[in-house]
Amino acid sequence: DGVVAINTLKAMAIDVESGRPILGNRFGGLSGPAIKPVAVRCVFDLADALEIPVIGVGGISRWQDAAEMIMAGAAGVQVGTALRNPEGYGIFRSIAEGLSTYLERKEMTLEELRGIAGRFS
């Protein structure tokens, strides 16, 4: 068992000249870096409330983003929108190597990092 949180948020944009929705189907979704603070908060709340793993999703494009999700309590992370970056699938290696270097520098394990933000509340 586990839970994945979050993904795209409901969004809409309106042309101020015509008053018409810009997107063809009227509604769309907001994803990527713009939703990361919302995603981190959701992961923090869910990890605190649940006894099952939480996978953090939303705005992860750098190792620092993954670290932040893990600090909020995520057992793992998912990358989506960032795959469109020029780095492509190389982002996985970049995130893993950056996180590994960070943990070595901090002399911490991934488990010690997980949920650390909750220890300050």
Region roles according to the model:
Residues 38-42, 65, 91-99, 109:
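General structural feature for long, well-ordered alpha-helical segments within catalytic domains
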Residues 2-12, 59-60, 65-94:
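Glycine-rich phosphate-binding active-site loops on the catalytic face of alpha/beta enzymes
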Residues 36, 52-64:
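Glycine-rich beta-to-alpha transition loops that act as phosphate-gripper elements at the mouths
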Residues 30-33, 56-57, 79-80:
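Thr-Gly-centered strand-to-loop micro-motif
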Residues 1-52:
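Glycine/Thr-rich beta-alpha phosphate-binding loop at enzyme active sites
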Residues 1, 48-51, 75, 97-108:
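Generic secondary-structure signature for well-ordered alpha-helical cores
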Residues 36, 97-121:
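Extended, intrinsically disordered, low-complexity segments
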